[in-house]
Amino acid sequence: MAKQHFYLKLNPPRASFTFDMTNDEKLVMQHHVSYWKPYVENGIVLVLGPVLDPKGGFGIAVIGVDDEMQLETLIANDPANGLNSYEIYPMKATSKFINSIS
């Protein structure tokens, strides 16, 4: 079965978040990075990281999953979910790691 691909945008609680996180928020974000690292290593996450927009940073990911339930589970278990909010967009993706447009 072909993977379904999604673009995720992680919106912080405030525009200045990237620059003025509290110690507790930094800890949550460290856990967030640790949570996603195995999914980067196993290829579920194709791209992951912060966008350093001076008007207000945010995070992005491009993810290939078997179904939307898998995506929902990944997001629900993210330690940063709740502190931050997700926008989710389906994609028609192709790359050298993907055999065809999905």
Could you tell me what each predicted segment is?
Residues 1-102:
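Conserved, structured core segments of small domains
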